[in-house]
Amino acid sequence: MALAFRFAEERDVPAVVALIESAYRGEASRAGWTTEADLLDGQRTDADAVLAVVRAPGRAMLLAEAEAEAEAETEAEADGQLAGCCQLERRPSAEAYFGMFSVRPGRQGQGWGRQILAEAERLARDDCGAATMVMSVLAQRGELIAWYERRGYHRTGESRPFPYGNARYGIPKRPDLSFVTLSKPLVGLNLL
């Protein structure tokens, strides 16, 4: 199914927060394979964090909406719910940051994530002039890291600790959480 893309506006913030939470936390997230429910409790993000992305220069929240949602799981899903989203941020040195990547849990594994990632890479390269896309992923998410590696990302060797003690980022269920940085060159991808 094809996706239509647009950038989030302030009115979209509640729906974006709900989508991100459903993809990563709680029992509902177990419908997809991106769940962090075994690693973290609490929130994944909040309205203030998403609003900051929407309002800040050089940052954007890309939204994906399914075109002709004829196969919606319920009528409510066909009526204005998001298929997925991701944060894009222009950084110095021709780099773009990719984060808060979420796909509706009941629709994961159907190619929507690949479409969203490809559009984010295109925007970063063509509209932001980025030569490289970078992201942070929980080191304990081996299956997710492998998914990104199959799409051309590689580990940079950089890591940072999880922000323990700050419930805004979730409540850890284990003491060894950390993030690894992944990177992918965006230039020269479509030369042929």
Region roles according to the model:
Residues 129-146, 151-192:
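C-terminal "cap" of GNAT-fold acetyltransferases
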Residues 21-50:
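Conserved GNAT-fold acetyl-CoA-binding loop/helix
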Residues 65, 101-109, 137-139:
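A short, internal acetyl-CoA/4′-phosphopantetheine-binding micro-motif in the GNAT/acyltransferase core
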Residues 90-101, 108, 127-131:
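A conserved beta-turn-beta hairpin within the catalytic core of GNAT-like acetyltransferases
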Residues 1-14, 180, 185-192:
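Conserved N-terminal entry element of GNAT/NAT acetyltransferase domains
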Residues 107, 111-119:
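Conserved acetyl-CoA pyrophosphate-binding loop and the N-cap/start of the following alpha-helix
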Residues 63, 79-90, 97-102:
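Conserved beta-strand in the GNAT
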Residues 44-63, 175-178:
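A short helix-loop-beta-strand connector motif used in the catalytic cores of GNAT acetyltransferases and
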